[in-house]
Amino acid sequence: MDRRKYFGTDGVRGAVGSDRMSPYFVVKLARAAGRFLAERLEREGSPSTEGSLAVILGKDTRISGYGLESAMVAGFASVGVSALQTGPLPTPGVAYLTRAFRLPLGVVISASHNPYGDNGIKFFGEDGRKLSDAEELRIEQLIDVEDGKPDAVAARWGRARRIVGAQDRYVEFCKSAFPNSMSLKGLKIVVDAANGAGWDVAGKVFRELGADVSLLGCEPNGYNINDGVGATHPENLRAAVLAQSADYGVAIDGDGDRCLMADNEGNLYDGDDLLYVIARGKLQDKDGLRSLGGVVGTVMCNMGLQTAFSRLGVPFARSGVGDKLVLDLMLQKGWRLGGEGSGHVIVLDKHNTGDGCIAALQALQAERVLGKKLKEIAAEWSRIPASQGSFRLADAPNWEFRVKDETEKLRKELGDSGRVLVRPSGTEPIVRLLVEAPEMETARRGVERLRLAALAGD
């Protein structure tokens, strides 16, 4: 059972001004994270000294990021930890810089694909991976005993410094994921950065690799992150690609860790498609399947994807939802590719967290390796009809038993030809529903049966 009360599936997240996302709480969170670092150094036999502790601190473009960043800096400084600030930078960029600077912690202020009224905090360790549940739980314990704890003595207070060129470092890192022998010359690509953290870097990545780049969602004003743009609104990317006669469109979300693509015919490609395309490309590598190992998806990945990988002889396994759980299973199995339909794709020989720009580059690389268009590669697998829905926890007290009974009935009816998933969200007070079936109408009816069962009351 998950004992964490502040952290969810992707850090701490909430409405700005709420108990979990106020300057007061963020100061406490930063102080607790700083004490967590000091504890770890003590255990490792290298206690901190003046100026020895520092963290990378990045953010997206939300208006609240300015105040929460200041609160985070103040909290860290008061317990002797310096903050190296990147300014707006995609989450995978902060993960990369944490490793590159050999620092013990990276921090991102972002609520990912959520609207500007939300914000969040997530932490990365020295290896660029998100902290484990146990590490997050320890930080929570330190938050709860924070009141009354003394500040560091004046001589050991931390500093705040800007990292010059953080964005350019990240651009070069992304470009290194694309072979030097290949170029994007001749391609016109629409890049949609969701008015978020990637607004100043995503376009540069593709332009500097030779593409003719047109920008969408690259005019942040603090309030328009994910507002009708980005990976959560692919219909606008598709429209822009068609209107501009572009070859492809690449949409990332507000913090740049997920990606969706569109082609010149208006076809959209989600994370499931990208997993298949990238895997097909990697099977052409010198060591092929031996190097790839297998592919990790989540419980939300379409059944058709699993069937397609089976035909290729590629092992496939499912994790829980969230790129942290995907990565955990990848590492456990020693596999190099994983992701989820929402667009989080982890290519482990390139980066150890989801990265929207790198995922798109890997898909474009697969095109060149296979000598096929994205459409042709993705057409090699077929989706099983799927319907999704949800209900609010506030509307359905004691829903578990009612939904369990209906779930068992549906699974018995579908047998091996479909799938039923009931999953409480890790970031919102809702329960998500998924039914896959041979026909869409059957899937839709299944979701409605589950929803009505939940709302039926006692």
Give residue spans per PLM region.
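An N-terminal, well-structured beta->alpha segment
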Residues: 1-74, 78-79, 105, 159-187, ...
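Phosphate-binding and adjacent anionic-ligand microenvironments
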Residues: 246-248, 286-458
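N-terminal small/polar loop signature for handling phosphorylated ligands or for N-terminal nucleophile
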Residues: 39-48, 53-118, 204-262
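Proline/glycine-rich low-complexity loops and linkers
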Residues: 93, 137-172, 264-341, 346
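Buried hydrophobic positions in well-ordered alpha/beta secondary-structure cores of metabolic enzymes
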Residues: 10, 57, 94, 107, ...
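Short glycine-rich phosphate-binding loop at a beta-alpha junction
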Residues: 44-60, 188-191, 293-299, 336, ...
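Gly/Ser/Thr-enriched, mixed-charge loops and adjacent short helices
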Residues: 1-2, 119-244
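Gly/Ser/Thr-rich active-site loops/lids in small-molecule metabolic enzymes
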Residues: 130-132, 215-216, 267-286, 356-366, ...
